[in-house]
Amino acid sequence: MKTFTAKPETVKRDWFVVDAAGQTLGRLATEIASRLRGKHKPEYTPHVDTGDYIVVINAEQIRVTGAKTTDKMYYSHSGFPGGIKSINFEKLIAKAPERVIETAVKGMLPKNPLGRDMYRKLKVYAGAAHPHTAQQPQELKI
């Protein structure tokens, strides 16, 4: 019997909506990253993007454990000398709540062109409203 490998043109992708309200950041991000890769499907193939589309709502209500609210730092660098910037979780969740989940999930995906394609299937929104109702996303309990 031959080993099955998925073809990019035959992959069926579903849409799922995840409510992040009250969820722990890391536990939610690992499940989302796994589903973006397609590891929950029997036809998973490492070199083919077999994952689903994930819409995350209520990103502003995500939580972290311990003192990470004030201690967890996010860094960015402009590329110029002395160009490092840092912001803590508390300020970032107030400024751009979507970036918290996006950063966590992006770090869990492969760092190559396939990983970038997987990341594009993640849609994160701060509130409960999202513009993807036409895709009829199914609710995903995590």
Swiss-Prot record:
Keywords: Ribonucleoprotein, Ribosomal protein. This protein is one of the early assembly proteins of the 50S ribosomal subunit, although it is not seen to bind rRNA by itself. It is important during the early stages of 50S assembly. Part of the 50S ribosomal subunit. HAMAP family: Ribosomal_uL13 (MF_01366). Belongs to the universal ribosomal protein uL13 family. Gene3D superfamilies: Ribosomal protein L13. This is Large ribosomal subunit protein uL13. The keyword ATP-binding does not apply. GO terms for molecular function: mRNA binding; structural constituent of ribosome. One of its GO terms (cellular component) is cytosolic large ribosomal subunit. GO terms for biological process: negative regulation of translation; translation. It comes from Pseudomonas fluorescens (strain Pf0-1). CDD domains: Ribosomal_L13.
